[in-house]
């Protein structure tokens, strides 16, 4: 009797130990389920291990999920109806005769409401219809979370994603092509989570066709965390004509399927057709019958394969065939990942807990500072810090990331406008130093000025036509002769104003764009240092409006000053200013005078203009005069006087009395226009750069602080509640404080669960009890 009693005690103890192990496993599953919900809500960096199901619409994805669950969920149907991922937290409960389901709240994922299968199905269908009506975002990455307890459920977390679409090419299928890209982007984003095990479904008897693997391998190239599943095995077996085809299908070569995939080789599954219900179209009366049909289908598949092969399947081959084998493998794998991840998740939860504590402290401090004196002081402090950041950006800094805030010259031209001449052409941006670098602040301002100098300094005088010269001659108020010096001035100033005025407006727009960019960069620097007035949008908008208005008005004022300079230098020609390169003009006219010939009476006679007509001194002889003097030395004085008079008459005839434009007159006008245009260009370039530096850049440094301070004090004199929106802000902060406190308690509770679980996993006694789930579902 004593022996029997001892044996009874031993059996009872073993049963208690098994129950304890199962209970601890369930506790760990629950902790991970809570962690997964928390990660979805807060978008935290940690994720719980889960199985992500990926497949085409026609791969039997929904049927496979139902077979793994042990009951028909019927949440999709035909076509593209799953538009949000569905997370199924499944828990094995032998006492649960019917599926017990809870639906996670979209507003608070920590809250799960008990729902029937029909209610959950109705909710999912309503969500799908809602998203289908939104053309801009027909799919959503936010998961629908469902918790299920059932006697046939495995202990798994499965995320069922929308089915991938393979649309036909052509314009008429454009809408479906857009949907296909949206689904693929959603699925690819889900696969990025390194903790997820990817269940890749393929419906093909040829492993060289990688419909779903093509997308999966973009994220997991080696398939190291991917389980490949060949679905609809029962329909493929009859397609094989010989045993060798079956051998290749069951054991694909490395050239067709990478051997590094998770599980070493693919799984093969079949799910019997037919729905559970009491209608005429129903095949199964209950989920128990459906479960039995799944098991029977598995045995039939093995028998059919053995018949095709002409041999019995090995133990290794059988371990890859059927829903039950796939479910057991997933459970063991997920359980292993759960245990391995516990020590890694604890520090992440600790970090998130400390971050939430700091967030709560910040909210509490903001609530305590909502009085007039403190708000005014914070506003003045923000003013000083904002100006400090502006000055820092102009002087140069590397604190703001160039990849986020910098602009290349091409970007700058696109956003702020390009320098374009009257011909509509642009210089290549590659000719400008640092064109490919992403700059901001003072460095970007300097590059824009350098581009302006480079482009304007290289501008040549536009072509001059004979018609323009003749039209510019006109008629004087006292005589009808021609004045080619006036003609040259009229043409030069008109060409200069037409050429340079657009560049002035373009320079103003470009520099205005660069200076306005200082505002968001300064805000970023303040946020980075924790000095940003978060929640005070009305006040911040007022500061931003004052800054932008100041920059815009200052740029306009500066541009008006530059326009006055351009108007003055193109209204009246001052020879000492405009004719900068008189030596070049003399050289041009000297060569002209030495080569110009008059063939009248067979005598070769050259002529030159007096020096004072060219703006030079009268005591300096030109080379043409020297040549003429040398020519006249062999002629008697009477002949010399006669020749000089003839030359003077010819000169007056060609430049004063004759309206027929001679080549000599045309060349003189062209030379004068070139010199005047060059003088205007040099003056315009120096004046514009100097004025933009003095009257646009410098006011940012020395006038903006006083203006912002005045704007700030005026704002304080107004209704302070309207400026800082104290009432709404207090309500918002109170709500934020309550939600942060709830979040903190949730993190603390989950953190404590994982801490206790980690201690038990590390204990020798618990390690002996915790084995892979051995419950037969």
Swiss-Prot record:
GO terms for cellular component: chloroplast; chloroplast outer membrane; cytosol; peroxisome. Gene3D superfamilies: P-loop containing nucleotide triphosphate hydrolases. Residues 45-343 form the Dynamin-type G domain. GTP binds at residues 55-62, 160-164, 231-234. Induction: Induced by gibberellic acid (GA). It is a peripheral membrane protein. SMART domains: DYNc. GTPase activity is repressed by PDV2 thus increasing stability at the plastid outer envelope membranes (OEMs) periphery. Its EC number is 3.6.5.5. Stabilized at the plastid outer envelope membranes (OEMs) in the constriction site when in complex with GTP, but destabilized after conversion of GTP into GDP leading to turnover with a cytosolic pool. Forms a homodimer and heterodimers with DRP3A and DRP3B on peroxisomes. Also interacts with FIS1A (but not FIS1B) and PEX11 proteins (PEX11A, PEX11B, PEX11C, PEX11D and PEX11E) on peroxisomes. Interacts with PDV1 and PDV2. Belongs to the TRAFAC class dynamin-like GTPase superfamily. Dynamin/Fzo/YdjA family. This is Dynamin-like protein ARC5. The lineage of its organism: Eukaryota, Viridiplantae, Streptophyta, Embryophyta, Tracheophyta. The gene is ARC5.
């Amino acid at each position: 009797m004593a022996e029997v009693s001892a044996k009874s005690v031993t059996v009872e103890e073993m049963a208690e130990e098994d129950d304890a192990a199962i209970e601890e496993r369930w506790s760990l599953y629950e902790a991970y389920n809570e962690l997964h919900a928390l990660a979805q809500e807060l978008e935290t960096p940690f994720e719980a291990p889960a199985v992500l199901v990926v497949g085409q619409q026609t791969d039997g994805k929904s049927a496979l999920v139902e077979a793994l669950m042990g009951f028909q969920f019927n949440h999709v149907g035909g076509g593209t109806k799953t538009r949000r991922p569905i997370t199924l937290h499944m828990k094995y409960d032998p006492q649960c005769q019917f599926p017990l389901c809870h639906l996670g709240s979209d507003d608070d994922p920590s809250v799960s409401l008990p729902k029937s299968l029909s209610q959950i199905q109705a909710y999912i269908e309503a969500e799908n219809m809602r998203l289908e009506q939104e053309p801009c975002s027909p799919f959503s990455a936010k998961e629908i979370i469902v918790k299920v307890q059932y006697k046939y459920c495995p202990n798994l977390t499965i995320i069922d994603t929308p089915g991938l679409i393979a649309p036909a090419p052509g314009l008429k299928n454009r809408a479906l092509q857009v949907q296909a890209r949206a689904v693929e982007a959603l699925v690819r984003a889900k696969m990025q989570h390194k903790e997820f095990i990817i269940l890749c479904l393929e419906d093909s008897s040829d492993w060289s066709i990688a419909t779903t693997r093509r997308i999966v391998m973009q994220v997991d190239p080696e398939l190291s965390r991917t389980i490949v599943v060949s679905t609809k095995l029962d329909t493929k077996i009859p397609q094989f004509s010989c045993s060798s085809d079956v051998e290749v299908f069951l054991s694909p070569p490395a050239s067709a399927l990478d051997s590094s995939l998770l599980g070493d080789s693919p799984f093969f599954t079949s799910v019997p057709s037919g729905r559970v219900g009491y209608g005429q179209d129903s095949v199964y009366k209950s989920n128990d019958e459906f479960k039995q049909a799944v098991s029977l289908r598995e045995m039939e598949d093995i028998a059919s394969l053995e018949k095709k092969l002409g041999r019995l399947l090995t133990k290794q081959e059988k371990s890859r065939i059927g829903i039950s084998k796939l479910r057991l493998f997933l459970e063991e794998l997920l359980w292993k990942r759960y245990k391995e991840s516990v020590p890694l998740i604890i520090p992440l939860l600790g970090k998130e807990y400390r971050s939430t504590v700091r967030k709560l402290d910040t909210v509490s401090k903001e609530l305590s500072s909502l009085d007039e004196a403190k708000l005014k002081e914070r506003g003045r402090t923000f003013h000083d810090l904002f100006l400090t950041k502006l000055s820092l950006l102009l002087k140069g800094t590397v604190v703001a990331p160039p990849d986020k805030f910098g602009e290349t010259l091409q970007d700058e031209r696109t956003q702020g406008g390009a320098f374009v001449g009257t011909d509509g052409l642009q210089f290549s941006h590659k000719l400008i130093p640092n064109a490919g670098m992403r700059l901001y602040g003072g460095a970007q301002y300097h590059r824009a000025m350098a581009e302006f100098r480079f482009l304007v300094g290289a501008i040549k005088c536009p072509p001059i036509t004979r018609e323009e010269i003749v039209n510019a001659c006109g008629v004087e108020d006292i005589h009808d002769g021609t004045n080619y010096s006036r003609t040259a001035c009229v043409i030069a100033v008109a060409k200069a104003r037409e050429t340079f005025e657009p560049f002035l407006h373009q320079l103003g727009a470009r520099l205005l764009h660069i200076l306005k960019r200082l505002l968001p960069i300064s805000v970023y620097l303040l946020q980075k240092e924790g000095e940003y007035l978060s929640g005070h949008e009305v006040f911040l908008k007022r500061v931003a409006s004052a800054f932008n208005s100041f920059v815009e008005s200052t740029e306009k004022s500066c541009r008006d000053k530059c326009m006055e300079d351009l108007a003055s230098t193109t209204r009246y020609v001052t020879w000492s200013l405009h004719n900068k390169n008189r030596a070049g003009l003399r050289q041009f006219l000297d060569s002209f005078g030495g080569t110009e010939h008059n063939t009248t009476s067979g005598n070769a006679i050259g002529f030159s203009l007096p020096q004072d007509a060219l703006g030079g001194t009268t005591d300096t002889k030109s080379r043409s005069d020297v040549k003429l003097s040398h020519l006249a030395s062999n002629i008697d004085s009477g002949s010399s006087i006669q020749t000089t008079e003839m030359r003077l008459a010819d000169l007056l005839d060609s430049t004063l009395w004759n309206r027929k434009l001679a080549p000599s007159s045309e060349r003189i006008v062209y030379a004068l226009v070139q010199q005047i245009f060059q003088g205007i260009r040099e003056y315009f370039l120096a004046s514009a750069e100097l004025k933009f530096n003095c009257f646009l850049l410098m006011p940012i440094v020395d006038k903006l602080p006083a203006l912002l301070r005045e704007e700030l004090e005026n704002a304080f004199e107004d209704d302070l509640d309207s400026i800082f929106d104290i009432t709404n802000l207090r309500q918002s902060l109170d709500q934020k404080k309550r939600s942060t406190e709830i979040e903190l308690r949730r993190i603390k509770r989950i953190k404590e669960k994982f801490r206790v679980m980690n201690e038990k996993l590390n204990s020798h006694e618990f390690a002996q009890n915790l084995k892979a789930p051995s419950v037969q579902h």
